[in-house]
Amino acid sequence: MMEIMIRKGKADDAADLADVETACFPPAEAATAEEIAARLSVYPSHFFLLYADGILTGFIDGMVTNEKDLRDEMYADASLHDEAGDWQMIFGLNTLPSYRRLGLAGRLIEAMKEDAKKQGRKGMGTRTKSWTN
């Protein structure tokens, strides 16, 4: 059985998080280390990192806002974060491919959800990528 630990983000996590992000998203969609560092500098407590047996295997992150709907600009502009906002956004839910289908992503969502509830948020919001065959 894996030992699971979830913690909040720190400024010096950017490079490690970028490595996970790169493993989880196509290059055109993956946030860079610089983009992640900018987010961490503004809202580190809205990053949740999951370690399985001491290995960083995934993370979830997103800003807080008074807007119910996630806009593209929010990904690029960390200054849009409003700690007093009503809505916790989810920008990315990342799990390394070799650790998928183990329930780890669900644990990350639950950690963010519980934190949002404790902070009195109205809810959480995200977007998914559209695709067609």
Where does each model-flagged region fall?
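Glycine-rich phosphate/pyrophosphate-binding loop shared by adenosine-nucleotide-utilizing enzymes
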Residues: I4, I55-F59, Q88
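A short beta-loop-alpha structural element at the N-terminal edge
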Residues: I4-L17
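Hydrophobic adenine-recognition pocket in adenosine-nucleotide-binding enzymes
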Residues: G9, L93-T95
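Helix-loop element at the rim of GNAT/NAT acetyltransferase active sites that forms part
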Residues: D19-A33
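Conserved beta-hairpin
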Residues: H46-I60, V64
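Conserved acetyl-CoA-binding loop-helix of GNAT-fold acetyltransferases
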Residues: T95, R101-E114
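Conserved GNAT acetyl-CoA-binding A-motif
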Residues: I109, A116-K129
